């Protein structure tokens, strides 16, 4: 945009010449925290607003997902705080059982060559607390760097004494209400870490495997419809056949339905097992016969329950074949329905070695029919890295069906709303098919299960051993041992909204801030965390009428931040970007070290190095926290996948610089000047009236966007107003009044400059807090505001009476006319400073009025020597024409353009574009490129092609115009 200089000499503004986030951010945050601005205001007569943070793992460090969600939360908290609400952002960290235990185990192994067993349970747990004291603050310090206005004095940890009491209380009450029980069921077992793990900790990998077709002989001389004395079963896990207790066929399958109720003689073991009819057997798949191993497969477990088949566990917790099998009935009680003998040659061998041995034996006996290549999904533990074994173990469970019923109703009747709404369906699909929840883990670090056993195996549940002895009249002569297991971390985080506010005590905080207002979370933990919080909260917390209370009124689901090519960010891909590296900047060397150092798979390092050098040849520049936050807000669309975009980050850093420089211009023209704050006549120009009306409309649209959780729209509204309307237009439009206006007009322009800037800073503050506070501290002096911080200033409100339709339409028309002139200059290669004469043809009454009322203004802004209205019958010289609303703008070309030179220039430009178009079309017609390149890359190429074609069309049109001169 062309700039007209402000001619008066002004003093240097109090704002530094360049915006330097590094110098501003941390001192400012420390000041905010020390001043107590993050705390609730304590005014309980005011409406409260509370968000609880999804507690990050105490072992963790800040990643893009955290930065994304926390930016959204802080934007909401700052917005509500500025509306005078009693605001609490409750923070804390999760003890992250398995993750933390592994971090400390690795540490003592590396530093001392010891295992946790060398320490023993108590000493090892002390070691973890010691580690937490030293390293556990990393993530909270990083959260401070993001500008999060969290009440740090209320920070909680899921193993704090208060939260531990809440966990015990919840467990005991659920047990007393028969909603917690101990049972033998199938779980995901990690043979390396020796613990049950949740589905979320299971990573399903696609692998090339085999399908073994095995012959199972029929008992008692029975034959199939085809006269065969055997069935063929197909399996991907032949080692589990030692635990088979049935063979399933589809009851509709004509080949086998007459065999239902007959028996098989299981090879290698000679166990007689029944043939059962079950829908689980698919007639179209494999041979239509499925071996059933209820103790080692989740589907088989369900089939076994339906047909009351015994369960035979053939594996140890290490994943080796047992010396003696464990035989249980369908209820998990020890059974003698089958022998527990296992042939000696398989005893004690590792499960995958057993697979080879068993297949070899089938082959020797002539019972191996064929081996087919087969693509299959294999579950791995995401931390232990080994294949997960479905294992029959004694675990503690929560009966979820009665809890889920209430939790489903809360969403159905609108007490809890999901944003975007489509996530409700995901919630319902989980909740309507809910299984009992396994809450015990075989770890040392975590909330130990509050259950004790006597020597006869009787179980007693209570808040402490003292309570158990007292309630059950157990003398000190009776020995009690506490359950060794700890609770799933999701159990304690399921109580998060109310345990952090003091439950089971009926605290003021609980009364004031519960139910909380909004939960911000990723859709990947909708079941593991969100659903469980709803179930637990509604069970334990009731309102004054005894109605179950929801944990939060709204659930705002964020998408997943992926890299620029749409790939998930992961260490093994080497595409993780640390949010703080974008804030502070990082050299290429340091970035490479970060991405390739300590890799689990060092062979990937070279590929990652090349990719990183290509993407960040000079490392990553400093962008500052505000630019990062603005980018994250702008990317917060309603989609599931959000591709990170470094160009947008650079664009929003430029935005911060633009706002800084605009503020310097405003301060230069207002500091120590008469801005009409103390009376004195004020005349507002059309430009002043327009920007005030424009700002008022912006406030309305911006608030609507924030109120409906459209942070992407809010960011765009803020960007558009600040960059385009305020900086590019209004600052230019204000110069004629400032430089040449009357005293009243100068006062009006100054008043408008400071008024709009101060309002804009308050408007932008929730998204970009640091830069807005820094500038506002200077602006408040000009405006005579006494307050200490922008954080507690009132948020701008839309005022119907400030609507000025006439100013909006008049100035939009003038802008359109000036843009038409500027476009002609650019297209015809006319110097920006060259004064032009403009003719207006077919001007309607509105256009004529606007020119008459604002002639000087239009001439100054368009660098025009004259504006002439042509009568309808008047002939115009050869001109370039643009249509605008209610008129045609003509600029006579005589003496302005060197026709031949201009045509030659345009031909060169067109030739260059043709080459580029050819190259892109070549790429896109290459099937190999289109099928192999990431979707985002192909889309970018298609966009480039469309842009090149548009540019070419424009150049051809210009060429035609010039050729006609």
From Swiss-Prot:
ATP binds at residue 571. The gene is valS. Its main location: cytoplasm. Its EC number is 6.1.1.9. Residues 1-23 are annotated as: Disordered. It comes from Photorhabdus laumondii subsp. laumondii (strain DSM 15139 / CIP 105565 / TT01) (Photorhabdus luminescens subsp. laumondii). Catalyzes the attachment of valine to tRNA(Val). As ValRS can inadvertently accommodate and process structurally similar amino acids such as threonine, to avoid such errors, it has a 'posttransfer' editing activity that hydrolyzes mischarged Thr-tRNA(Val) in a tRNA-dependent manner. It catalyses: tRNA(Val) + L-valine + ATP = L-valyl-tRNA(Val) + AMP + diphosphate. A motif ('KMSKS' region) lies at residues 568-572. It is found in: Cytoplasm. One of its GO terms (molecular function) is aminoacyl-tRNA deacylase activity. A motif ('HIGH' region) lies at residues 56-66. Residues 1-12 have a biased composition (Polar residues). Keywords: Aminoacyl-tRNA synthetase, ATP-binding, Coiled coil, Cytoplasm, Ligase, Nucleotide-binding, Protein biosynthesis. This is Valine--tRNA ligase. Residues 893-960 form a coiled coil. Monomer.
